[in-house]
Amino acid sequence: MEHRTSAVYKLVPSEIRNLTSEHALGNLRPGQGYKVESIRDWRPDFAFSHIFHFHLEERGRMFSFEEFREWSTLDRFQPMFHTPAWEKIKEAIAGGYSEQEAKNSLRWRIGIAYYSFVREMYVVARFRELGLDARFHPLADALFRTDTWIGDTSVALYIRNDAFRNGKVGRKPPAEKILGGEESGLKFIGLGIPTQPIWGEVHFPDDRAVEDCAGKLRILTAQR
């Protein structure tokens, strides 16, 4: 599907922060969410960033988790996500897991991806509010671990978690490794977000962290 980024650049940070949504993870806990490894590591053919971005552009605004769930069941969108998701559930059941265990892991996988997307959209909107020409495209996100970029500088956002990503530690490869590092002519910067003791909310970076990152980006942009 063709992707044009337009609605993303009209998002308002405060509206994203104040978005009312049901808890994307439900009442699940990590032990339940990560139980089925094939679902924990699932990367659908239509990447989550692709699916969420398509939905955002169609609605013209940030959407709640329940709005996404309803949208994904519409006939014309089922092949993007709903149908392959059920195939993963069937695969897990065939591998010895119960249907509920598979559904729990799927809910967790989707919920984590949704929260990540909301956080990315907030940072893009906040950077633009601060005067930076922050850009987004789902292919850059899915293929190159670039959550947003300004000029020739790639920005990666991540919750600090040694199992997945904490600076250069973790099993998720950073953008600089995928894109060839500074030899590629690109610059790279990360915006790490501390794990927060809250439940049922998006972990947004605090304003100071975003402003500090924006300051570094201005310096890097001026070096071109």
Language model: regions and residue ranges:
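Active-site beta-strand-loop-beta-strand hairpin of nuclease catalytic cores
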Residues: 149-156
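Nuclease-adjacent, charged terminal/linker segments that flank catalytic cores
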Residues: 1-88
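Surface-exposed polar/charged interaction patches
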Residues: 22, 95-99, 223
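Short, solvent-exposed polar/charged micro-motifs at secondary-structure junctions
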Residues: 145-149, 200-201
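Polar/charged alpha-helical tracts
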Residues: 14, 66, 87, 91-94, ...
